[in-house]
Amino acid sequence: MGPAMFMAFRLWNWLLLLAVLTRSEATSYVNESSNPTAQQAPDARFAASSSDPDEGISVFELDYDYVQIPYEVTLWILLASLAKIGFHLYHRLPHLMPESCLLIIVGALVGGIIFGTHHKSPPVMDSSIYFLYLLPPIVLESGYFMPTRPFFENIGSILWWAGLGALINAFGIGLSLYFICQIKAFGLGDINLLHNLLFGSLISAVDPVAVLAVFEEARVNEQLYMMIFGEALLNDGISVVLYNILIAFTKMHKFEDIEAVDILAGCARFVIVGCGGVFFGIIFGFISAFITRFTQNISAIEPLIVFMFSYLSYLAAETLYLSGILAITACAVTMKKYVEENVSQTSYTTIKYFMKMLSSVSETLIFIFMGVSTIGKNHEWNWAFICFTLLFCQIWRAISVFTLFYVSNQFRTFPFSIKDQFIIFYSGVRGAGSFSLAFLLPLSLFPRKKLFVTATLVVTYFTVFFQGITIGPLVRYLDVRKTNKKESINEELHSRLMDHLKAGIEDVCGQWSHYQVRDKFKKFDHRYLRKILIRRNLPKSSIVSLYKKLEMKQAIEMVETGILSSVASPTPYQSERIQGIKRLSPEDVESMRDILTRSMYQVRQRTLSYNKYNLKPQTSEKQAKEILIRRQNTLRESMRKGQSLPWGKPAGTKNFRYLSFPYSNPQAARREARAAEPTDDDGTDSGFQPLMFSIHSRAGSLQERRQTQAVIPMKRLQRGEKALSFSYRSNTSWEDQAGWRRMDVLRPKPLFYAVAEEYDSGEQTEEETSAILSRWTAEHRHSTEHHKSHSPLLHRK
């Protein structure tokens, strides 16, 4: 079924081609037989129909001139679209060669037919068509769908490689070819230095679109992918700026000599053109984001605002002789960040696919016209110039790659390996940019323009067909380091947490890196820009908003891939139940927020900055003390309410634990000591009679309990032992002891007969009493030491 459909689409291509040729012949016939005034005014056809009153109404007329330009453009776009459809019908073909190879082949076949039938190809490309209509959609799509975070994490290496690498390649190739042209045997003496430098600037413009497709399929590591992507994004802009400056030098050199001041002015213009283009793009991006803030009720015009303002940034920059490519790139990156949060989901889908469609159509037309231009008489062949051009392109790319990355690896945490550098060198595929710049050279300034076009076509064909086809097997053969699996929402959230943590650590250590810059920009963005440019500035956490955005993105991807196609929609009952939920009014929400603010405990905030020079040393100590006091107050309140514990254990459980106390609770031991009942014949030689506890009676008076507590230390003092801290309250002040005693008075005591049944005898011997007191002393010594070692206040200086 696949080959049959492929042949059917190929047949449609030939029929469309015959229709184009037939219309071209009809054009010549109509031009000879029609009224000459029809070519002078746009409404000549209507004037001609009413000029002769004796002429009757014709049933059938042919006026191809009236629809020639849109008709031919539509046929070319349709031919390119059918070629892409036929290319993807055969599933093995996209894995064998890039899509650009097929488009060039189709264009070469169409060009051969046009050349064989002695017809002139339609003017698909000239200076205004390329720079004003074909190039902006390609650059806009690349900038809008650029992965922002990896790009700005590697922005230093990308600018170092894309900027300086383009200059090294341009001047290296130009100077090398100039020395070759000085050899008289090659017959290239009429090509001066400026012409060679201009050719070097246009031939250094790379177009690794096919390489990026191979990288996405092979899932190479993120650093390697971003270096190629950044080169594809910025290299065209730098090459076009250098191309325009050298054309201006060529025009100047035709009438006067170039001085050192002119060279300095050219360097200054190079910087101003690039920075000015970026500034214009950011300004237009902010304006478009601000306008989309008010389009919630008219979402149909949101895609129009995005496309019009991006195109206006390009035109405004070109009006002031700035870089339109860098302007539309900066505008796309700015709109991606802010406009997406203002537009609806339907508008976002429309923007996404319409932008990809325009970019695909532009690239397809350029590649097809490249194939059409291959067959013709506008070529000049010189073996020396073409072969040395191909050789110097490879040599200078290798020099620039291995030299610049050797320097950048000295400052990178994760350096590029030799395999990565070789893949970057092999990815220098020339494409539509180089051919378009060569084709648009003015013939009056460059008499050897045909030679430049031929050399550009040879380099483009070699890199697209040879390097573009073999890059995939080479990546698999070298086993280039692959990227990890796609980050989940949890990993993305934790990466943001680590960014904040690293920024704080760097500030404390006095270091400075991109984490600090990113953190400061986020603060400025959240404080000023988002309040002005974003429609709904809700006071919610950035992590919550990021989670919502990632969830929405993941759901859209699942729907687009068909994963959710089999999932059933919610039942009508569920939808009615959801709709029937009462929504809270803003007043109710505000009152709930006030209640929670007053009632909930809020830990005092830490100092806002992490700077080591203004960090207060006593803040954390006060916080710890305050939290400990609050926990003790909570414990006292719970003990005043009775012995019923909140987690459902019986009142006499021994080993329960509060947060502010050590693990061995001294209160349980004190209850055991109070439960002990000494006998009358105790034999003790102390100066008082110890109190007797009745197991079935409740607690005695306050004076009796104080005397009972004083028995224990007096016994140990008489034995000659060293006085120690026997209870938890011995480490507290007099006021705290008074508080504990007041608490003991108010606290209800448990019924001892409900706790233990082994005390029903009502009597105990002296040995049993001594054993109980010894066990109570050991437990209190252990609990006191444990409390001292774990107290947060005792460890601070």
UniProtKB/Swiss-Prot annotation:
Intramembrane region residues: 14-28, 70-90, 421-441
Primary localization class, coarse: membrane
Q: Which GO terms describe its biological process?
A: gastric acid secretion; glandular epithelial cell development; regulation of pH; transepithelial ammonium transport
Task: Pull the Cytoplasmic topological domain ranges from the record.
Answer: 1-13, 29-69, 91-94, 149-154, 216-226, 292-304, 374-384, 472-797
Where is the stretch described as Disordered?
A: 32-52, 759-797
- Name the keywords, alphabetized: Antiport, Cell membrane, Cytoplasmic vesicle, Glycoprotein, Ion transport, Membrane, Phosphoprotein, Sodium, Sodium transport, Transmembrane, Transmembrane helix, Transport
User: Which one Pfam family would you cite for this protein?
Assistant: NEXCaM_BD
Q: Where in the cell is it found?
A: Basolateral cell membrane; Apical cell membrane; Zymogen granule membrane
Q: Where is the composition biased (Basic residues)?
A: 783-797
What is the regulatory mechanism acting on its activity?
Answer: Up-regulated in response to high extracellular sodium concentration.
Q: Which reaction(s) does its UniProt entry say it catalyses?
A: Na(+)(in) + H(+)(out) = Na(+)(out) + H(+)(in); Na(+)(out) + NH4(+)(in) = Na(+)(in) + NH4(+)(out)
Assembly and binders = Homodimer; each protomer has one site for sodium and one site for proton binding. Interacts with CHP1 and CHP2.
The task this protein performs is described as: Electroneutral antiporter that exchanges sodium for protons or ammonium ions at the basolateral membrane of epithelia to regulate cell volume and intracellular pH upon hypertonic conditions. As part of transcellular ammonia transport in renal tubules, mediates basolateral ammonium extrusion in the medullary thick ascending limb, regulating the corticopapillary ammonium gradient and overall renal acid excretion. Mediates sodium:proton exchange in gastric parietal cells secondary to cAMP-dependent acid secretion and hyperosmolarity.
Family label: Belongs to the monovalent cation:proton antiporter 1 (CPA1) transporter (TC 2.A.36) family.
Protein name (database record): Sodium/hydrogen exchanger 4
Query: Which taxonomic lineage does the organism of this UniProt entry have?
Result: Eukaryota, Metazoa, Chordata, Craniata, Vertebrata
Gene assigned in the entry: Slc9a4
